[in-house]
């Protein structure tokens, strides 16, 4: 599980574009806390802290504690908006969570031991179909990443979700199929050779008819 962190915030008494622009001029950005059957809470958070959290990785899989108006609220970042040109954060949505909360999160998949995969040694390419997987997981036990060992994989082999060991209490959001995470694809040269061989075999078969 990723380490939690504390984020200090101020209540927002005004909303709207004018208020948001004023916040940004003062080094803050607008945000909202919602969920848990409570009224949404409009807050302002530090632009600098949010910028580094977003670009540091793991932002949407790490539970945070927001200190605002004398209260401590556990949250999980659910969404954020970036400036389309400069990639600067403009707004953040936080979901209220507790130790009993179960949430949907996208967790990255990491692959190890590529050098121990015969298919890759022969020139095969690791074709990643899904860089992350949506999981249903307790909010206090979100894994930083899922890991798969590529040792022994050959060209043409596939990695399915069933091959990845999920932590206790964690399930994949997609339950109706054993979806593919990655494959070991043949290199372009080998594909060309195989196609040429197949073509030659077809010609021989025709000649023999």
UniProtKB/Swiss-Prot annotation:
Domain of life: Bacteria
InterPro entries the record matches: Rbsml_bL25/Gln-tRNA_synth_N, Ribosomal_bL25/Gln-tRNA_synth, Ribosomal_bL25_b-dom, Ribosomal_bL25_C, Ribosomal_bL25_long, Ribosomal_L25_dom, Ribosomal_uL5_bac-type
Pfam families: Ribosomal_L25p, Ribosomal_TL5_C
Keyword rRNA-binding tagged: yes
Family: Belongs to the bacterial ribosomal protein bL25 family. CTC subfamily.
Compositional bias annotation for Acidic residues: 200-209
Region (Disordered): 190-209
GO MF assignments: 5S rRNA binding; structural constituent of ribosome
HAMAP family registered for this protein in UniProt: Ribosomal_bL25_CTC
Subunit structure and binding partners: Part of the 50S ribosomal subunit; part of the 5S rRNA/L5/L18/L25 subcomplex. Contacts the 5S rRNA. Binds to the 5S rRNA independently of L5 and L18.
Functional description taken from the UniProt entry: This is one of the proteins that binds to the 5S RNA in the ribosome where it forms part of the central protuberance.
Swiss-Prot/TrEMBL keywords: Ribonucleoprotein, Ribosomal protein, RNA-binding, rRNA-binding
Name of this chain's protein: Large ribosomal subunit protein bL25
GO biological process, one term: translation
Annotated GO CC locations: cytosolic large ribosomal subunit
């Amino acid at each position: 599980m990723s380490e939690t962190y504390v984020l200090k915030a101020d209540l927002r008494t005004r909303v709207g574009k004018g208020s948001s622009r004023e916040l940004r001029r003062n080094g803050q950005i607008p945000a909202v806390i919602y969920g848990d059957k409570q009224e949404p809470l409009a807050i302002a958070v530090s632009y600098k802290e949010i910028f580094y959290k977003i670009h540091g990785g793991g932002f949407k899989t790490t539970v945070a504690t927001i200190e605002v108006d004398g209260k401590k609220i556990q949250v999980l970042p659910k969404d954020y908006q970036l400036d389309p040109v400069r990639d600067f954060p403009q707004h953040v949505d936080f979901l209220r969570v507790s130790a009993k909360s179960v949430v949907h999160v996208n967790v990255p998949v990491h692959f190890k031991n590529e050098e121990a995969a015969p298919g890759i040694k022969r020139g095969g390419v690791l074709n990643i179909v899904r860089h992350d997987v949506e999981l249903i997981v307790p909010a206090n036990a979100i894994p930083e990443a899922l890991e798969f060992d590529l040792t022994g994989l050959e060209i043409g082999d596939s990695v399915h979700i069933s091959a990845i060991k999920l932590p206790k209490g964690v399930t994949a959001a997609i339950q109706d199929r054993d979806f593919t995470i990655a494959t070991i694809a043949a290199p372009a040269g080998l594909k060309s050779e195989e196609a040429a061989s197949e073509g030659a075999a077809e010609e021989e078969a025709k000649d023999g008819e």
